[in-house]
Regions:
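Primarily NTPase-proximal linker/entry elements flanking Walker-type ATP/GTP-binding cores
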Residues: 1-60, 67-88, 95-103, 108-114
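Residue-level signature of catalytic and energy-coupling elements of molecular machines
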Residues: 31, 61, 113, 140, ...
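Switch/coupling sub-region of P-loop NTPases
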Residues: 74-164
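Conserved phosphate-handling catalytic cores of large alpha/beta enzymes
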Residues: 119, 128, 132, 139-248
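Conserved P-loop NTPase/AAA+ ATPase motor core
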Residues: 243, 251, 255-262, 270
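Small-residue-rich helix-loop
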Residues: 279-293
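Conserved small/polar residues in nucleotide/adenosyl-binding loops
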Residues: 295-301
Length: 305
């Protein structure tokens, strides 16, 4: 069963193509409310962190109130530069200005957050297709809400026909039934899933690995991803120092706070349990443990004060 699931999901994982002549242009498309703007920030943060590349974000959404400002705020919060907002510019003009700015300032990657559109809105679809062709995008990713069910699959088929997608970014996979939406998405839309959003934090974006998702669907956990998250979030030197302190029988409130902070960075106790075999089903029963942990994080500071 596991082998069949992997075959359905795709036997390999697909990486972003960022090897083109800078800047590599990544265009995010999708329906309204699918999470494109947040996903743009998550993707930019991930590329910056894992590939050590200089990333610029730009919003092409001139229709939704404060959409451009939202991306600017996310950029400021995560130390990612965004294109200066100039009012009354059309999406294509913004895209061309973003490309020119990215070239002049030597950015490696440009992420374009397009406006959310209705799949039956031909005018909006033509607009994004024109933008993609004019600026010669490197990657065209469709952002899809995995909770949308069959609608998500239909959306992927429609966008793939119009835009010739290079990949899919599934959001809210943490709320889905362990990733079941990914099954029909890959087989029906004929487009590889490249990333999955597994939470609300900017760090909660993972590369899509078919074998790991198959294990999650079958309730077998995903220990490899857990190890990778631990490697990303835990400072190796601090961990070694803490281990030496433990062996000497020393453990302070500050040490306790650091341990809880590390767990918090990795998604809390319930966030860790979903990666362990057989424990995903009980994680919802201990959600309150996260709240307790966050409260305890303030104890050392409160005690000192």
């Amino acid at each position: 069963v596991n082998d069949e699931l992997i075959e359905i999901l795709g036997s390999e994982n697909y990486e972003l193509n960022l090897k083109s002549k800078p800047p590599a242009i990544v265009l995010l498309a999708g329906l309204q409310g699918s999470g494109k703007t947040t996903s743009a920030a998550k993707l930019a943060k991930r590329i910056t962190k894992t590939s050590n590349k200089k990333v610029l974000m730009a919003s092409l959404d001139v229709y939704r109130p404060a959409a451009q400002e939202q991306l600017e705020v996310l950029g400021n919060q995560n130390q990612i530069q965004t294109l200066e907002i100039i009012k009354n510019q059309k999406p294509l003009e913004i895209a061309e200005r973003a490309v020119n700015f990215a070239k002049s300032e030597f950015f490696d990657v440009l992420i374009l957050d397009s406006a959310g559109r209705n799949q039956v809105d031909d005018k909006m679809m033509k607009e994004i297709v024109t933008i993609s062709k004019k600026i010669k995008t490197t990657e065209r990713l469709l952002v899809v809400d995995s909770m949308a069910g069959q609608d998500a699959v239909n959306t992927a088929k429609h966008f793939n026909t119009a835009l010739d997608l290079t990949g899919i970014l599934l959001t809210r996979v943490d709320g889905d039934s362990r990733g079941g939406a990914a099954l029909s998405m890959k087989s029906v839309a004929k487009c590889p899933i490249k990333f999955i959003g597994v939470g609300e934090k900017v760090e909660d974006l993972e590369e899509f690995h078919p074998d790991r998702i198959a294990n999650r669907i079958l309730g077998m956990g995903d220990v490899v991803t857990l190890v990778e998250k631990a490697h990303e979030e835990i400072n190796e030197k601090e961990a070694e120092d803490l281990q030496k302190r433990f062996l000497k029988g020393k453990f302070t409130l500050n040490d306790y706070s650091k341990q809880l902070n590390q767990i918090s960075k990795m998604g809390g106790i319930s966030g860790l349990l979903k990666y362990l075999p057989g424990l995903n089903e009980i994680k919802n029963k201990i959600e309150e443990s996260n709240a307790v942990s966050y409260t305890h994080l303030t104890l050392p500071t409160t005690t000192i004060v």
